[in-house]
Structures are given as C-alpha cells and as structure tokens.
Amino acid sequence: MERRTFLKRMWQAGLGAVTAAGAWTTWDILRTFPEGGLGGVIRTVLDQDVTPEEALYVRTAQTYLTRIDGAVVALWQRCPHLGCRVNWCESAGEFECACHGSFFNRAGEVRAGPAPRGMDRFKVEITVDGIVEVDTGEVAEGAPPGTQTLDEPPRGPGCAEA
C-alpha cells in the first residue's frame, strides 16, 4: 500500500469517528426521556398521601409534593438562584437552600434570599385510580419575588440555623 493511500484512509477513518461521536452527542442531547424518568411523566404516590402540612419528596421526579388550597402542587427541588438542591425543613415548615440562604414558603414562593423567583413547578394530574402523576417534561417558572399567597410564618427554627 502506498503512503498516500494509507494517509487517505486514515483521514477517512478519523473523520468517520468524529462524525459518529458528534451524531451520538447530538442524539443524546435531543432525545426525549423515557416515561417514568425525569423529563417525562412520573407516577408517584396516592393523592391522599399528600398533606397540606408537609412536603413529600419524590426522588424519581426530583420534586416535592404539597397540597395548597386543596390542590396537589409539584415543586422542583432545584433552587432558581444557582441550581442547588432545596431541602424541606420540617421544623420551620418551609423550604431552605443551604447554598446561598434562600427561603421558600410551602407554596414554593421566595420568602428571603438571593433567589430571583419562587421554586419552579411541574404539571400535576390525578389519575382515576388516585395516583399523582408529575409531568417533568415542562417546567413552569416560579412566582416573582413578593408573591405571598400563603400567610404562614415559619413554624419554628430553620434547619440551617440549627
């Protein structure tokens, strides 16, 4: 085999490998998530298990479920400030972001801290058999600062303060 032919084939093989890697990366970014995984519809818990006093964490949906004015609300665990995980503080009855000190009420509305808006939400549907389904494929932005639909001060000391 001549040197020229060898180099030509090596260039073709290299170009093919780069094209395949680019196609794989593009497919991986653009593909939809399977049903039951983040980015899709996730069946969670029974409607009756979601109470107005607490926030129930659903790991597969990366979501907290709570009940506001009789309706189940799904709040994304991600802080809208810089994306840290927001935790439910049972003693205070509110959500706290330990990264930069944002506080959110039970409805996910920002109460204090650097967060630019309330916690983002996912669409919720209750099936005929009473299962709460969370559609994590579409994110609804949280309420702007100053929105306070719940008149609930913290119940006690915050978890970050303890």
Which functions belong to the PLM regions below?
Residues 5-92, 125-162:
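N-terminal pre-ligand scaffold of iron-sulfur
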Residues 78-120, 125:
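Structured, soluble extracytoplasmic/luminal domains of envelope-associated proteins
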